């Protein structure tokens, strides 16, 4: 599962829904964007059988982290890579995991949150920042994962060129892999604690779009994919919808 947790926005109202989501349907693997220390603590509480990266680099608590079910995976190594994302401590975050069951192949699990189109630099020069960031992600994962099975999860903040870059880099999203198109992942509506119609840059509301993705590459097969509709006591956990997918890792002898 990949999930943008919407930073600190209305977090107090959303905490019960975040907790309920992960308690009701805990994923084996979870990638997050717009993470904060408080929401990280909520996820930790809701996923007691999972481990995540513990590291002094601030981005693991203020941008993204990666969780895995401990009975299924062992951590081999982890790291970050600067891929040009214009936000403090934003990186490509990744882990290499070894499945415990049978002789399944190792897996690189990674995430990033590409720069928002409303960033001051992009508004000033009118140049798409995410295309180059996607190119750097592909280059980084070429080096990190090589020919290994690789999952890349992302809030891509775009509907065009960055997606094409990933596809031409050998990645296939979990819906295309099944001959489908993704449902909308942002924005979630209704949100009872949000009354504004527009955004801080425009009176227009944010259009419905799919910007949250799970991509795969290498020896790993997509079996199912879903954009999750979830509310708890009338509240959504975020202004994004989580995306969940099921994969099969072949054995090392296959």
Which positions does each model-derived feature cover?
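N-terminal, active-site-proximal structural segment of metallo-dependent hydrolase catalytic domains
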Residues: 1-46, 62, 107, 249-254
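Acidic/histidine-rich helix-loop elements
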Residues: 2-16, 84-86, 115-129
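Active-site environment of divalent metal-dependent phosphoester hydrolases
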Residues: 7-10, 37-41, 60-61, 117-120, ...
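Structured beta-strand-rich core segments of catalytic domains in phosphoester-bond hydrolases
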Residues: 29-116, 226-227
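His/acidic metal-ligating clusters that form di-metal
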Residues: 101-112, 126-153, 165
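Metal-dependent phosphoester-hydrolase catalytic domains
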Residues: 142-150, 158-254
């Amino acid at each position: 599962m990949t999930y943008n947790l919407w930073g600190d926005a209305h977090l107090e109202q959303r905490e019960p829904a975040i907790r309920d989501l992960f308690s009701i349907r805990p994923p084996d693997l979870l990638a997050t964007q717009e993470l904060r220390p408080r929401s990280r603590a909520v996820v930790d509480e809701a996923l007691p059988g999972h481990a995540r990266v513990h590291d002094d680099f601030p981005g693991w608590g203020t941008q993204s982290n990666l969780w895995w079910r401990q009975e299924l995976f062992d951590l081999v190594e982890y790291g970050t890579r600067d891929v040009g994302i214009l936000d403090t401590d934003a990186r490509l975050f990744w882990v290499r995991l070894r499945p415990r069951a049978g002789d399944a192949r190792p897996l690189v699990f990674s995430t990033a949150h590409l720069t928002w189109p409303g960033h001051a630099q992009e508004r000033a020069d009118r140049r798409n920042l995410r295309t180059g960031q996607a190119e750097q992600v592909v280059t980084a994962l070429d080096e990190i994962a090589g020919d290994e099975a690789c999952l890349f999860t992302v809030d891509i903040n775009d509907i065009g060129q960055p997606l094409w870059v990933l596809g031409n880099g050998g990645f296939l999203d979990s819906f295309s892999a099944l001959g489908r198109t993704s449902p909308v992942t942002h924005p979630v509506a209704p949100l009872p604690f949000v009354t504004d119609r527009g955004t801080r840059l425009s009176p227009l509301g944010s259009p419905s779009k799919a910007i949250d993705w799970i991509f795969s590459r290498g020896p790993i097969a997509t079996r199912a994919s879903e954009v999750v509709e979830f509310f708890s006591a009338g509240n959504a956990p975020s202004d994004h919808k989580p995306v969940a997918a099921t994969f099969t890792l072949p054995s090392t002898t296959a």
